[in-house]
């Protein structure tokens, strides 16, 4: 990895250009499978290349070189996020949001939300999370039916986050959040669809509903503020406290985008990942047997002991980590060059838009022997293949690494543990190969279904 400011005397290479079609450029490769497309670019052109999508030019930096660069001071100084997220900020009438800020402004927002997005925010509530999950399974996973897994997981995520954060799960808004997120990410963030799509009634209705949800969350959070002790605050309470106590940091204009953020962030990411875990575990009977044995032992004693939860679930945790390697949500990170710099011998100009392909090493045999094989033991010592520098980036890299990482790890582990403990599931056919989608984030297709054969353990008990 190397990066220097352009003022330094360096030998600059000519950056190769990715071959694409007239007008659309590399759109179809990106739309079909962005992860595979970025790997192809790395293998063909190296860690730096240029490509066009719908008339816009981007620089793609990828591989371990790019992943490691993101964590350096040079990466922090040379790249910023604002351009890609400003359209979303404007759409909500806000002044700023966490994902679109850098430097001190970004740190200020992370400090406000850090506790609420950490696993400490649900300490002492694991059994409550289990009960919420059981309710979701009883409601959305009927015995004898083929269940659309991504949709069922989306309802579970909103049920969990809503109940834990506000005491109320806004399940009536799931489809609106999903629709609004799809349009906003495709049109305003990744810019792979024309802006005129935002005039569609389907989007306008969904956006209006999400705004209504945000306004209701504001009213509820204001009502709780006077009666909630600082040590008892959750994420929503912390955001409202910042608004009331330091309005310059959290003005009223930013409340809706900040308060609905957990739903928008978690709906696709956690739901896509857990849906992919269901597929991977069911696809590999030997993994399924290990996971079931493990989770049955976890719940055999009744209420959970929260201490060292993930250490008690090496097979399930390995399955989740391996799923996140093969089906990453953060295929690439979107950035703009904040100054002229040279990366791996290639000049990148201030203001140029970049894709940072941090997931490319996930699929490289050099780092993961048998990279295409689902192997849940890669993460245990002495192998620990994920600890090689720059090879594993399921939550992104750099200053914008997912703030909710530790919370998501617990949420996904408990959700999957309960699913495989409670339900007897099967793929629609043994030979089924997962169909995937790329928008708004990569993951299993909404058409992916599993059949609920029955309950492994009685619905009314653990």
What are these regions (language model features)?
Residues 64-75:
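Short active-site loop/helix that positions an aromatic residue
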Residues 13-23, 126, 229-237, 280-329, ...:
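Cytochrome P450 I-helix active-site segment
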């Amino acid at each position: 990895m190397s990066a220097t400011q352009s003022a330094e005397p360096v030998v600059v290479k000519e950056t190769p250009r990715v071959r694409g079609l007239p007008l659309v450029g590399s759109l179809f490769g990106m739309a079909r499978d962005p992860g595979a497309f970025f790997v192809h670019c790395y293998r063909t052109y190296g860690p730096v290349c240029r490509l066009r999508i719908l008339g816009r030019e981007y620089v793609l930096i990828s591989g371990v070189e790019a992943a490691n660069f993101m964590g350096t001071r040079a990466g922090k100084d040379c790249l910023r996020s604002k351009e890609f997220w400003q359209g979303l900020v404007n759409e909500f009438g806000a002044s700023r949001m966490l994902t679109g800020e850098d430097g001190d402004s970004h740190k200020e927002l992370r400090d406000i939300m850090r506790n609420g997005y950490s696993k400490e925010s649900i300490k002492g509530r694991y059994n409550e999370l289990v009960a919420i999950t059981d309710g979701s399974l009883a409601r959305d996973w009927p015995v004898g039916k083929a269940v659309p897994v991504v949709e069922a997981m989306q309802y579970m995520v909103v049920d969990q986050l809503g109940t834990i954060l506000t005491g109320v799960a806004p399940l009536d808004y799931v489809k609106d959040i999903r629709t609004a997120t799809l349009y906003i990410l495709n049109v305003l963030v990744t810019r792979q669809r024309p802006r005129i799509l935002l005039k569609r009634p389907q989007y306008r209705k969904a956006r209006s509903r999400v705004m209504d949800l945000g306004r209701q969350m504001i009213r509820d959070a204001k009502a709780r503020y006077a009666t909630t002790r600082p040590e008892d605050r959750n994420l929503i309470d912390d955001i409202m406290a910042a608004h009331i106590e330091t309005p310059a940091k959290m003005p009223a204009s930013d409340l809706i985008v900040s308060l609905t953020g957990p739903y928008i962030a978690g709906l696709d990411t956690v739901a896509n990942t857990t849906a992919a875990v269901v597929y991977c575990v069911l696809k590999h009977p030997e993994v399924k047997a290990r996971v079931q044995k493990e989770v049955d032992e976890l719940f055999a004693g009744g209420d959970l002991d929260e201490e060292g939860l993930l250490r008690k679930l090496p097979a399930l945790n390995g399955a989740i980590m391996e799923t996140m390697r093969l089906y990453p949500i953060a295929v690439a990170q979107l950035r703009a060059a904040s100054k002229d710099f040279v990366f791996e011998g290639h000049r990148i100009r201030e203001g140029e838009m970049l894709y940072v392909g941090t997931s490319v090493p996930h699929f490289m045999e050099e780092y993961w022997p048998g990279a295409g094989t689902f192997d849940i033991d890669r993460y245990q010592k002495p192998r620990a293949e994920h600890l090689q520098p720059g090879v594993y980036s399921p939550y992104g890299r750099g200053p914008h690494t997912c703030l909710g990482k530790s919370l998501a790890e617990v949420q996904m582990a408990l959700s999957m543990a309960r699913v495989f403990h409670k339900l007897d599931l099967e793929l629609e056919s043994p030979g089924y190969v997962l169909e995937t989608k790329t928008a708004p984030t990569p993951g299993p297709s909404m058409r992916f279904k599993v059949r609920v054969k029955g309950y492994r353990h009685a619905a009314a008990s653990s």
